[in-house]
Design a protein with these regions (language model features):
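C-terminal lobe and adjacent flexible extensions of AdoMet/dcAdoMet transferase-like proteins
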Residues: 195-203
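A short acidic, Gly/Pro-enriched loop at the edge of an enzyme's catalytic core
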Residues: 88-99
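C-terminal alpha-helical "lid/dimerization" subdomain adjacent to the S-adenosyl-L-methionine
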Residues: 5-18, 132-192
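A short glycine-rich, Lys/Arg-flanked "PGG" loop and its adjoining helix->strand segment in the class I
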Residues: 113-125
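Conserved alpha-helix/loop element of class I SAM-dependent methyltransferases that forms part
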Residues: 14-34, 44-48
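Class I SAM-dependent methyltransferase SAM/SAH-binding core
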Residues: 36-38, 42-89
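A short SAM/SAH-binding and catalytic strip from SAM-dependent methyltransferases
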Residues: 98-111
Length: 203
């Protein structure tokens, strides 16, 4: 990612994701105890965590993102420990957190299977994964458009896949569906309308 893109991305995220605040708040109401947030980013989730959360382990390799996110966390009064790493290789012990959170991150990781396996490793038995992500559109024509623009989209948006199909990755993982819904967010470009909001539990 270029320096310019890395510095602009926090503000792009804010503009795109703020309208989803109520949906994110509802999802994060299930967080508790020790939480790992994959891709803490600009800290948009910081003020949405309930009082049941003791601390947040913020996995965030981007210094410009962390500069914004850490300030928001401090303002929200959330205890946050930064981990400068990528989701495919988390420098955390097994069974070290109660809940993993991934909002608008799995679209950009290089190896979704490895990331989901790592999250399952670090989450304690009975723990949860809270997921909010844009996914492949069910309409074949739109899915084809998503795939066609993926190379250019990845360049413009830090490796993001506009229509990554998450089902094969989740089915191959150790996560079982607890609650799952697919919704369209129409304020976003049509190629990223379809989103999945879900809770999974370690199998």
């Amino acid at each position: 990612m270029s320096d310019l893109a890395e510095r602009l991305l926090p503000w792009v995220n804010d503009i795109a994701l703020r309208p989803a605040t109520s949906r994110r708040r509802a999802l994060l109401s299930h967080a508790h105890g020790d939480v790992l947030e994959l891709g803490f980013g600009s800290g948009l989730n910081a003020a949405l965590y309930p009082s049941a959360v003791d601390r947040v382990v913020a996995v965030e390799p981007s210094a410009p993102m962390w500069a914004v996110g850490s300030k928001r966390a401090a303002k929200a009064g959330v205890t946050v420990d930064r981990v400068d790493a990528f989701g495919e290789d988390l420098p955390l012990p097994d069974n070290s957190v109660d809940v993993a959170v991934s909002t608008f991150v799995l679209c950009s990781v290089r190896d979704p299977d490895a990331v989901l396996a790592e999250l399952a490793r670090v989450v304690r038995p009975g723990g949860s994964l809270l997921l909010f992500e844009h996914v492949e559109h069910p309409a074949a024509a739109m899915a084809a458009v998503q795939q066609a623009i993926t190379p250019a989209w990845k360049v413009c948006f830090a490796g993001c896949h506009p229509g990554r199909c998450m089902d094969p990755h989740l089915h191959a993982s150790l996560w079982e569906v607890e609650d799952q819904q697919d919704v369209d967010l129409h304020w976003l470009p049509p190629v990223i309308w379809r989103h999945r909001i879900a809770r999974y539990r370690v199998a």
